[in-house]
Every structure is written in C-alpha cells, then in structure tokens.
Amino acid sequence: MRLLKFVCLLASVAAAKPTPGASHKVIEHLDFVPEGWQMVGAADPAAIIDFWLAIERENPEKLYDTIYDVSTPGRAQYGKHLKREELDDLLRPRAETSESIINWLTNGGVNPQHIRDEGDWVRFSTNVKTAETLMNTRFNVFKDNLNSVSKIRTLEYSVPVAISAHVQMIQPTTLFGRQKPQNSLILNPLTKDLESMSVEEFAASQCRSLVTTACLRELYGLGDRVTQARDDNRIGVSGFLEEYAQYRDLELFLSRFEPSAKGFNFSEGLIAGGKNTQGGPGSSTEANLDMQYVVGLSHKAKVTYYSTAGRGPLIPDLSQPSQASNNNEPYLEQLRYLVKLPKNQLPSVLTTSYGDTEQSLPASYTKATCDLFAQLGTMGVSVIFSSGDTGPGSSCQTNDGKNATRFNPIYPASCPFVTSIGGTVGTGPERAVSFSSGGFSDRFPRPQYQDNAVKDYLKILGNQWSGLFDPNGRAFPDIAAQGSNYAVYDKGRMTGVSGTSASAPAMAAIIAQLNDFRLAKGSPVLGFLNPWIYSKGFSGFTDIVDGGSRGCTGYDIYSGLKAKKVPYASWNATKGWDPVTGFGTPNFQALTKVLP
C-alpha cells in the first residue's frame, strides 16, 4: 500500500511538471505538492490569471547602498531620502530588458492591453493556455483536503533562456495561499474592577494590570506630549484579512482613555479592492487595537488605515495547514501601491501586525517583498513589524519534507530592512513576555549594522541550541514594548488584547513622536531606523534583562497538531541585545538626546 501511494505521488508530480526544453530555464519549482493539497486535474485553458513579474536587477547593490547611505548617521547622504521619481530612476531596468520581456509576452499571445510596465515589475493577465506555453509548464487545479478550496497552480515554471537572467519571479504560480496567516493576537477577558478604573488610576498603575495610553505615556516618558499636525509626519497602519478599523470604537476608546484627543480620526487608503466596512459581525479586533493606540499616542498626526484585499501566499506547514481561494498577494499589492505614492503622500511610519513563518513563504517572494521594504526606507519610511507570538518557534520543524527539528523565524520581522518589535510585560522592572518571537533568519544574512551587538550575544549563548538556528542570519527583534493585556474597544465593549501586535503600533506612535521632535528642529524624519538604533540609538532604550521566551512544546500552538518538542526551548533576555526584546523598551526623553 505504501509503495502504491508513493508511485501515485510520483505520478502526480510528474503530471504537474513538463519536461524542460533546452531553450527554457527553470525559475522556480517545488519538489512536491505542498502538504494538505491534492492535484485533482488540469486547469481550464480559458481561466484568466493575473500575474506579477519581478525583473531581476542588474546591480541589486545599488538599492542596498542607497538605503544605508540615507539611513546611517554620519554619512554624507544621511536623511536625504529619495523622491519617488529618484527611486524609479534607481530601479529602472535598461530599456532593452523591459522590451525583451514585453516582446516575450506579446509574441506569446498576451494582449498588449493586458500588460502594465511598472519599471522593475511587469503585471500581465492571460489565460491558462497562453501562460502554459509562455512558461513551459502545466497549470493544474489543486484542492485543499481540509476545506475543499481549489486553486490553479503549478509546481514549476520556466522562461526562455534568452530572458531568464532578467526574471526574478512570476507569481501566482508556485504560491499556495493560506486561510489564516499567522498574526499576533491573544484576547483576555477583563475584570469589572479594571473596567471601572479612571484614566488617572491607569496612569498610576504603570501598566501592571492593564495597558492603556495613559500608562504607556508614563512608562515610556511621553508625558502629555502630542505630535503637531504636519503633512510630513504621517502614520500608516496596515490592514489585511478583512480586518476593519471601526470609527465608533475609536471614539469610545479616546473618550475613555485620551479625552484630549476626542474628535481626532483617521483616513482610509483602500488597496486592490480593500474595504473598511463599518459595523457587522466581521473581525475588527486587530485593526481596532492598532488604530486606537496609534491615534491615542500621537493623535494630531495624520493617520491612514491601508486596507488591502486578499490573503497571502504560503507553503503549508503545521502552523497554518488550511488554505484560501483568494489569488491576491496582499504584501505585494500594498507595497507596490505605497512605493508608487508621491513622497508627500507616503507615511513616515508604517506599522504592520501580521507575520508568517519564514519557511512558509517561497524564497523569491521574501526577497522581492523585503526589497520593497528597502525601497520604502529609501524614501524615509520607518517600517515597523511585530516580531510574532511563538517564542523561538511553534511547530519547530522544517516543511521541506525532511521534518527536521528547527526553530521557526518569522517574516517580515526577519527582513533586515524593517524594525522588528518584541514584547515585554510588567514594570519595575519590565520583563520579556514568554510569547515574544525572535531568533535568526534562515533566508537573510546578518546585516553589518548589527554585527557587534549580535556577536556579543552569541558569545554569551555559546553552543546552546546549536543546529536549531543559523547564527549568521539576520537577528530579530530589534527593540520591544509592552505586549500584554492592552485595553481595546471592540464592537462597543472593552476587552484585553495581548501580543506583539500590540507592541508594534505603540512603538510606531513613539517613532512618530520622535519624528515630530526632529521636524520641529528642521531635521528630516528618521526613515529606516536600524542603522541608527544599532550605532547610537540603543542607549535611549531600557535594557531588559529579566524573563525570556518559550516555544517548541511538542504541539503547534495554532493548529494543535503534534510537532517537534525541544525541552526548555527559549531565548533569554540578557544584558545588551537579545533575541526576545532586542535592545529593550523606549525612554522617550533619553531617545531625544541621542537622535542623529
């Protein structure tokens, strides 16, 4: 029976992969049908698919050199962030490169009206039959065995050798979407005594029982400071998975916790069919959490909720075995939208409280989106991400068919061009919260800006957890903030929310306050934060040396499926940088003294 199943599996894989011709080069391939999916038959030749094609840059170092030049204090170009037109010029491929790709598409049968040249990206729509010929592949219908959702995908695709050096990736092809991408969100019921506390009592509590804007202001030294209303200091809040920020809940929150901010609101940026529906039974907790703390801590800043339709492309692993039918790629949709905005419409801070295990995304996809975060950084955007809520890992095993024991880094927190925010709990002193994710990337090498700090930590760590992580990978998180039991109004009622999804918007608001401080003195916004944080800014953060993260318990915390167990798996908070709280939590007054 086992032999028969193995033979059938080989047959299905063979049916999904045509024999590559000598004139074509394979761009991407999967070794097997992802776990939880079954190939059920050939795709309808007339079915239409919308594709993204990322053009491989001839000199990728130009982008990286530029972001470090404008983001590293002491360099001549520091703070001289690019305009959109300057970024376009930096990334624009040679005319003959774009022409060769467009000619390949049109000669292959794609209607020229369905092709959009966006410089370093090309978007095109065509039917399955034409796409199969173009990419020397066979598209099939794959069914999710758990929820019967079907998708048109392939396990491998190629392009002509003549243009292969110019193609970084084409998607959706090998991307199998998820229904519930990992996000940081833990709900806690509130006791009646907490619900009845006054603003003054919350401030005096120093976040010991419930986190509010009042106690964060006290704990992190903001006092009653607010940002000024300026066009050059905007905050963007990312919304995915049909999460909608509710105006009525924000009004209730501000009335209760920030009375001086009553009447302040946010605008909407709706991307790729995104919505921000008010009322109704849909989920809104994450969106409300983000918006209430961003507006509450910096209420005069211009805040935009960027709602993007669609669900992300992931390769199934134990943490997220269920799939979705939406073909949109939300990060790509959002990021391509943002990098095309004029500089005066861009947020100076963008906070996002979503993430996926790094291994569950194809390598080409993580590289392409990480580069887009870098592009935002060159234009002066501080990109903030929550680090995740699984400690060193949840499933703690690889999804490459080997099922090897391995810690699970989180993406985009592991991208070297974002600032990753871990979580703390308690006061006097603050401690690392046990769920705060962190670790070392398996995709991105450690950037030079964090060499010294991470090497110091690795000396302390020694051989502990050897083989379970890549010590040469990009280390995260970078910094941290309170992450346990935030007061949030949702559907008219107050609840408690925990997770690094709470830490990220709180930190974003504090960064906006620092930008406001700099702008008032005639200096530009901070932009990409990490080179400053690791060179000098770290001294403005309170080092967290107590507590630690936990994970790898033998069961995946999201799916409940049995997984690898690593006894006592953890990252401990230590003196200096560590992979659970980074450099620690902000002290606003101290930070203003070490600004570049």
From Swiss-Prot:
GO process terms (BP): proteolysis
Q: Which PANTHER family match?
A: PROTEASE S8 TRIPEPTIDYL PEPTIDASE I CLN2, TRIPEPTIDYL PEPTIDASE SED3 (AFU_ORTHOLOGUE AFUA_3G08930)
- Please state the span of the N-terminal signal peptide per the UniProt entry: 1-16
Q: Which residues are glycosylated?
A: 265, 403, 572
* Binding-site residues, Ca(2+): 543-544, 576, 578
Name the chain's protein.
Probable tripeptidyl-peptidase SED2
Please give the residues making up the propeptide in this record. 17-203
As for subcellular location, the record says: Secreted, Extracellular space
Which UniProt keywords are listed?
Calcium, Glycoprotein, Hydrolase, Metal-binding, Protease, Secreted, Serine protease, Signal, Virulence, Zymogen
According to its UniProt record, the EC number is 3.4.14.10
Q: Can you tell me which residues the record assigns to a coiled coil?
A: none
Residue limits of the Peptidase S53 domain?
210-596
The function of this protein is: Secreted tripeptidyl-peptidase which degrades proteins at acidic pHs and is involved in virulence.
Q: What PROSITE patterns does UniProt report for this protein, alphabetically? A: SEDOLISIN (PS51695)
Cofactor: binding details: Binds 1 Ca(2+) ion per subunit.
Q: Name one GO molecular function term.
A: metal ion binding
Residue positions of the active site: 286, 290, 501
Gene3D superfamilies documented for this protein: Peptidase S8/S53 domain
Top-rank EC class of the record's enzyme: hydrolase
Query: What SMART domains does this protein map onto?
Result: Pro-kuma_activ
The catalysed reaction is: Release of an N-terminal tripeptide from a polypeptide
